[in-house]
Structure formats: C-alpha cells, structure tokens
Swiss-Prot record:
Its cofactor is Zn(2+). This is Endoribonuclease YbeY. Single strand-specific metallo-endoribonuclease involved in late-stage 70S ribosome quality control and in maturation of the 3' terminus of the 16S rRNA. GO terms for molecular function: metalloendopeptidase activity; RNA endonuclease activity; zinc ion binding. It comes from Rhodococcus opacus (strain B4). Its EC number is 3.1.-.-. It is an enzyme of class 3 (hydrolase). GO terms for biological process: rRNA processing.
C-alpha cells in the first residue's frame, strides 16, 4: 500500500499519523493491499479555491476527496490490471481543521485523523447527502477511528511489556539487558 503525503499548508503536521490512520482504514475496509492514495495538505486560500471550483461553495472547508472511480459504499477499487489501484486524492486544510478542533475541544491531531478517515470513506463510495447515508458513514467513521486508537493503545502496551520483559530477562541472565 502506497500513501504519499504532500504538506503544502505551512503547518507542522504529523504525516506519519495521517499515513497510519489512512493505512488502518484501507486495510480494515479490505481494500487491495497494492492500493495507492495521495494526501495533500493545503492552506485556507487553496482550499477555498478548490471548494469553489469543485463544489461551487464559497470559503474553505476541512476535507475534500477526489476518487479515481465512482464506487458504491463499501465498494472495492480492485483494478483488473496487475499492479496498484489508485484510490484517489484527499485534500486536508489543517488551519480550518485547527479551528474545528478548538471548537470541539480536542487536539488538532485528532481532528486530522477524523478527517482522514472521512476522506478515505468518501474515496470508497460513502457519502452523507441523505440522512440514512449520513448515519451509516458517520457510524462507520467513528467506529474506525475508535478501532485505530485502540490499535495504537494496544501497540504501546505491547511495546511497554516487551521492554519490561527484556529488562527482566536480561537481569535473569537470559540475554544482555539494555542500558538503564
């Protein structure tokens, strides 16, 4: 799976975290492992221009998705040709997201993770134009985000336990203990 991030926003953002959440969602949604995704982070002026050009709406927005193929919700972008399948592009506006995060009372990193999940779901054919679609998409979005956070917590726990075990086994003489 190839995920490329281009940060043109002028804001310091953890690209690794965006890649992590996008990779998690793509894998969880059973998309072909050779799929490709492009993410671009832009400033408010660029996002406002894209928003007007593609949605005919004034002002910036938080996230826009540009799928390569029109899919049904849950559809799989499996290319008949060998090689990777391009899902599309996700455009994020960190400055707009920062304002939303402040209003919601959570960190910018959480808002960007949420928007990344949202963007990937749009690429996979999900939408929220109708109430039933919104219920399905937002429910799935929240579940995927919760699952990703749980996965991160589990990985941190496992790493802490492994470090503790290595230290204890080193003291018992099973192998060299790391420097303390």
């Amino acid at each position: 799976m190839s995920i490329e991030v281009s940060n043109e926003s002028g804001m310091d953002v953890s690209e690794e975290e965006l890649i992590s959440v996008a990779r998690f969602v793509i894998a969880r949604m059973d998309v072909h492992p050779a799929a490709e995704l492009s993410m671009v982070l832009v400033d408010s002026a660029t996002m406002a221009d894209l928003h007007m050009r593609w949605m005919d709406l004034p002002g910036p927005t938080d996230v826009m998705s540009f799928p390569m193929d029109e899919l049904e919700p849950g559809g799989r972008p499996d290319s008949p040709e060998p090689g990777p399948s391009m899902l599309g592009d996700i455009v994020l506006c960190p400055s707009f997201a920062a304002d939303q995060a402040e209003k919601a009372g959570h960190p910018l990193a959480h808002e960007l993770a949420l928007l990344t999940v949202h963007g990937v779901l749009h690429l996979l054919g999900y939408d929220h134009a109708e109430p039933e679609e919104e219920k399905e998409m937002f429910g799935l979005q929240n579940q995927l985000l919760d699952d990703w956070y749980e996965d991160l917590r589990r990985a941190e726990r496992d790493a802490a336990l492994a470090a503790r075990d290595q230290k204890l086994l080193g003291k018992a003489g099973f192998f060299d203990a790391p420097d303390q």
